C-alpha cells in the first residue's frame, strides 16, 4: 500500500514539475504541439519515421518549432534556409552535441563525435592535423583506397556469380582504409576478429536507429531495464578491447621521433603532455577517438554503397549509363582514379542522387545550444536540445522536383554537366559536419566505378519488383536486406 502511495506522490510531483516547466519555459520557445505530462509529444511522433512526422508538424507550426520527446523540450529546425542560418551562419551557437544516457556511457564525453567544449575542439583539431599529414584528401589516401579495392574485386570474383549479400565485403574497404591510417596495417577479410569488429559496428548502428534507443533517450530510466541497449554496450566493450590491443602493440614499439600512424602521433602527444593534469590527450580519449573514426568512416560509407547497388539493380538504365561513361573515360583495364570524376558528370550525379534519395541520416543526433540564443524571434535557452531535419533540405521539392523519385537529373544541368546544390546536406553542415566527408566521397566513387568496371549487376528478381524502402526509417535509413550476383565482364 505504501508503495502505491509513494508512486502516486512521485507521479504527481512529476506532473507538477512538468506543468511548471511548461508555464515558465515554453512560453518563450518556438510554437509546437501541446505536450502531455511525462509523455510529451512522443505519442504524436511516429518513432519509426520521425522525419515524416517532422514534415507534418512543420507544415502546421512553421520551420522552427518545439516538441517534447519526454519531459524536455527539443527545438526542431526544418527547411534549408533555417538549417543554413543555424548550422552554418551561426554554427558556434548550435555546435554542442546533446548526450543520451546510452551514448554518454559509451563516449564519456570524449572523442570527436559526442564530445563538447575544449575536449572536442582540441581532439578534432589534432585528429584533422594528423589525418592530413598522413595523406587524407591527397593522393596518398587515394592509393590506399585503390589498393583495398583490388582485394574487394578479388573477393567478389570468388563468389563466381552466385547470389551473395554484399554487406560485409563493402564494409571491409572503408574499415581497412581507416585501419591503415590508424593501425598502419590492413586485415584479411577472413580474420575472425576483424569480422567481429565490423559486425559490432553494424549491430550498433541498427540499435541506435531503433525505436527503443530513441525511447531510452527520452526516458533515461529505461536504460536500467533489460533491452537491446545492453547488447549495444556489450559490443562497445568488445570493440574497445580490440582497439586497446592495437594500442598496446604500438606502445611496445613506439619510436618518439618517427610516428607511423594515428596511434603513434597520439601516444607521442600524450607523452609530451604527461605532466599536464588538465590534458585532453589521455588513453581513454584515444580509445574513444579511434572508435569514432572507425564509426564515421565505415558504416555510413558501406551502407550508402550497398543502398546504391540496390538502386542500380532497380534502375538498370542508370547502371548502363554509368558503365558507358566508365568505358569512355577510364576504359576496361586502367583502374579508376579521382581525376576521372571531373570527366564523369553522370556518375558524379548518380552518387549524389543516391545519397540524397536514401537520406541515410534524416535527423542527426541532436545538438544543443552553447549559449542563450535569439533565433528568428524566439528565445532558445543555453543547453536546449536542437534537432536538424536534414530531410527537409535533401527532399526539398523546389530544389529537387519530385524529391521522392530517384533521378540523377537532380544534379545535372541542361547540358549534362554536373550541377552542385547547396541543399545537398548528406554529411550535415557547419562545425559538426562529418569529419570523414572527403574520404567518404573518394571511397564511394572509387568503389562504385571499380565494381561496375569489372562486373555486371544481376538481380534475383525483376527490377520492377525490387523494394527500396528502408527497413528502419527512423534516425537512420537502413537498406533492406538483399542479394545479387556479380557477373564478371
Curated annotation (Swiss-Prot):
Enzyme Commission number(s) of this protein: 1.14.14.-
SUPFAM superfamilies: Cytochrome P450
Keyword Ribosomal protein: no
A Gene Ontology term for the protein's cellular component: cytoplasm
Signal peptide (residue range): 1-27
Cofactor (UniProt): heme
Enzyme class: oxidoreductase
Disulfide bond recorded as keyword: no
Membrane topology listed for this record: Peripheral membrane protein
Reactions that this protein is recorded to catalyse: chenodeoxycholate + reduced [NADPH--hemoprotein reductase] + O2 = alpha-muricholate + oxidized [NADPH--hemoprotein reductase] + H2O + H(+); ursodeoxycholate + reduced [NADPH--hemoprotein reductase] + O2 = beta-muricholate + oxidized [NADPH--hemoprotein reductase] + H2O + H(+)
Location of the protein in the cell: Endoplasmic reticulum membrane; Microsome membrane
GO BP terms: organic acid metabolic process; xenobiotic metabolic process
Residue sites binding heme per the record: 434
Alphabetized Pfam families for the sequence: p450
PANTHER family on file: CYTOCHROME P450 2C70, CYTOCHROME P450 508A4-RELATED
Entry's family note: Belongs to the cytochrome P450 family.
Role of this protein: A cytochrome P450 monooxygenase involved in muricholic acid (MCA) synthesis. Hydroxylates at the 6-beta position two major bile acids, chenodeoxycholic acid (CDCA) and ursodeoxycholic acid (UDCA) to form alpha-MCA and beta-MCA, respectively. May regulate NR1H4/farnesoid X receptor signaling, as taurine-conjugated MCAs are antagonists of NR1H4. Mechanistically, uses molecular oxygen inserting one oxygen atom into a substrate, and reducing the second into a water molecule, with two electrons provided by NADPH via cytochrome P450 reductase (CPR; NADPH-ferrihemoprotein reductase).
Protein name, UniProt field: Cytochrome P450 2C70
Name of encoding gene: Cyp2c70
Amino acid at each position: 500500500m505504501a508503495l502505491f502511495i509513494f508512486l502516486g506522490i512521485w507521479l504527481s510531483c512529476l506532473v507538477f514539475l512538468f506543468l511548471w516547466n511548461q508555464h515558465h519555459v515554453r512560453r518563450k520557445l518556438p510554437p509546437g504541439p501541446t505536450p502531455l505530462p511525462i509523455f510529451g509529444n512522443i505519442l504524436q511522433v511516429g518513432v519509426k519515421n520521425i522525419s515524416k512526422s517532422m514534415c507534418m508538424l512543420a507544415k502546421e507550426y512553421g520551420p522552427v518549432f518545439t516538441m517534447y520527446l519526454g519531459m524536455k523540450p527539443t527545438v526542431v529546425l526544418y527547411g534549408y534556409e533555417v538549417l543554413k542560418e543555424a548550422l552554418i551562419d551561426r554554427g558556434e551557437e548550435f555546435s554542442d552535441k546533446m548526450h543520451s544516457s546510452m551514448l554518454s556511457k559509451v563516449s564519456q564525453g570524449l572523442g570527436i563525435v559526442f564530445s563538447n567544449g575544449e575536449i572536442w575542439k582540441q581532439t578534432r583539431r589534432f585528429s584533422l592535423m594528423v589525418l592530413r599529414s598522413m595523406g587524407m584528401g591527397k593522393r596518398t589516401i587515394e592509393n590506399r583506397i585503390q589498393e583495398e579495392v583490388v582485394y574487394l574485386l578479388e573477393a567478389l570474383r570468388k563468389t563466381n556469380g552466385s547470389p551473395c549479400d554484399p554487406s560485409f565485403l563493402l564494409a571491409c574497404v572503408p574499415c581497412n582504409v581507416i585501419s591503415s591510417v590508424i593501425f598502419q596495417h590492413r586485415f584479411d577479410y577472413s580474420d575472425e576478429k576483424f569480422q567481429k569488429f565490423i559486425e559490432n559496428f553494424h549491430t550498433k548502428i541498427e540499435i541506435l536507429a531503433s525505436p527503443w534507443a530513441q525511447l531510452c533517450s527520452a526516458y533515461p530510466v529505461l536504460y536500467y531495464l533489460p533491452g537491446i541497449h545492453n547488447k549495444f554496450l556489450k559490443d562497445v566493450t568488445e570493440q574497445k578491447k580490440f582497439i586497446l590491443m592495437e594500442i598496446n602493440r604500438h606502445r611496445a614499439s613506439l619510436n618518439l621521433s618517427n610516428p607511423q600512424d594515428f596511434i603513434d602521433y597520439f601516444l607521442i602527444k600524450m607523452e609530451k603532455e604527461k605532466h599536464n593534469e588538465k590534458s585532453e590527450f589521455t588513453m581513454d580519449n584515444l580509445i574513444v577517438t579511434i572508435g569514432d573514426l572507425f564509426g564515421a568512416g565505415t558504416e555510413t560509407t558501406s551502407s550508402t554503397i550497398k543502398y546504391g547497388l540496390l538502386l542500380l539493380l532497380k534502375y538498370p538504365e542508370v547502371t548502363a549509363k554509368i558503365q558507358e561513361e566508365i568505358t569512355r573515360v577510364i576504359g576496361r583495364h586502367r583502374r579508376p582514379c579521382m581525376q576521372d570524376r571531373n570527366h564523369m558528370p553522370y556518375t558524379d550525379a548518380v552518387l549524389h542522387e543516391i545519397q540524397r534519395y536514401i537520406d541515410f541520416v534524416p535527423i542527426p543526433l541532436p545538438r544543443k545550444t552553447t549559449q542563450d540564443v535569439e533565433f528568428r524571434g524566439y528565445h532558445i535557452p543555453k543547453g536546449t536540445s536542437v534537432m536538424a531535419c536534414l530531410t527537409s533540405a535533401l527532399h526539398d521539392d523546389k530544389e529537387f522536383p519530385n524529391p521522392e523519385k530517384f533521378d540523377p537529373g537532380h544534379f545535372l544541368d541542361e547540358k549534362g554537366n554536373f550541377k552542385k546544390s547547396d541543399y545537398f546536406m548528406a554529411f550535415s553542415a557547419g562545425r559538426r559536419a562529418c569529419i570523414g566527408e572527403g574520404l567518404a566521397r573518394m571511397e564511394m566513387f572509387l568503389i562504385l566505378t571499380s565494381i561496375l568496371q569489372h562486373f555486371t549487376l544481376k538481380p534475383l528478381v525483376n527490377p520492377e519488383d525490387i523494394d527500396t524502402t528502408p527497413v528502419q526509417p527512423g534516425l537512420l535509413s537502413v537498406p533492406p536486406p538483399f542479394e545479387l550476383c556479380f557477373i564478371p565482364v
